[in-house]
Amino acid sequence: MHTRTVFFISDGTGITAETFGNAILAQFDIKPRHVRLPFIDTEDKAHQAVRRINHTAELEGKKPIVFTTLVNMSVLRIIQENCQGMLLDMFGTFIRPLEGELGIKSLHRVGRFADVSLSKEYTDRIEAINFSLDHDDGQSHRDLSGADVILVGVSRSGKTPTSLYLAMQCGLKVANYPLIPEDFERKQLPPALEPHRKKIFGLTILPERLSQIRNERRPGSKYADLANCRHEVAEAEAMMRRSGIRWLSTTTKSIEEIATTILQEVRPERLVY
């Protein structure tokens, strides 16, 4: 497998450059070494970044790959004219054609989160994160009427990371509840969830994968035993079918794929904004 150092340079956090760059790199069978250089917003910082890139090129004998999301043209020019890496200017690639199509100049505003802390979207997102943390793993039954989505599934099926992703990325208030042996004995959902059935979405997972995950946490326990995992998954899926709950398997899906599927099923309007 090929290895290569990849730089993500931005005058903001670098998250956009890294996300976009990783999506492209995933198409190649390489093992990249990631270096994120955020807040490169002055010419002095640009020269420092160039020195680091060029040192890496000399040390490794290969051109580093450099993804940039820089809106300050003087900073970008220093990188373009001096770095010994393969430069992929993401903003330049898309902004100039868009300026031509829209017939207006871009704002060239540094940092896509400028003034975000004052926006309603930001406030709503913080509230969603707090709600999801308070309602993680069945900790609280309060204010379930305020939930956008309620996730259910056996322990370690992916409920918590999915809840937090939906809160942080989509601003959704998400509660999640583990289905436990007492629920299986009653053959019913937890009583607190019944009034909110329309908001419920189920997560399941292959027993073999569940056993593997649980063994990392509690090796050799009944909790992680494959037979027990098979029993819990079968009972949970049967309960979801009886209750008419929509559900999916998380076994081979990323958090992003799980969250998008839930949005499509439960809150499709949130895909349009």
UniProtKB/Swiss-Prot annotation:
Binding-site list for ADP: G153, V154, S155, R156, S157, G158, K159, T160
Keyword Secreted: no
Enzyme Commission number: 2.7.11.33, 2.7.4.28
Keywords from the named record: Kinase, Nucleotide-binding, Serine/threonine-protein kinase, Transferase
Root EC class: transferase
InterPro entries cross-referenced by the UniProt entry: Kinase-pyrophosphorylase, PSRP
Molecular-function GO terms, alphabetical: ADP binding; ATP binding; phosphotransferase activity, phosphate group as acceptor; protein serine/threonine kinase activity
Catalytic activity of the protein: [pyruvate, water dikinase] + ADP = [pyruvate, water dikinase]-phosphate + AMP + H(+); [pyruvate, water dikinase]-phosphate + phosphate + H(+) = [pyruvate, water dikinase] + diphosphate
Main function: Bifunctional serine/threonine kinase and phosphorylase involved in the regulation of the phosphoenolpyruvate synthase (PEPS) by catalyzing its phosphorylation/dephosphorylation.
Protein name (record): Putative phosphoenolpyruvate synthase regulatory protein
Annotated organism of origin: Paracidovorax citrulli (strain AAC00-1)
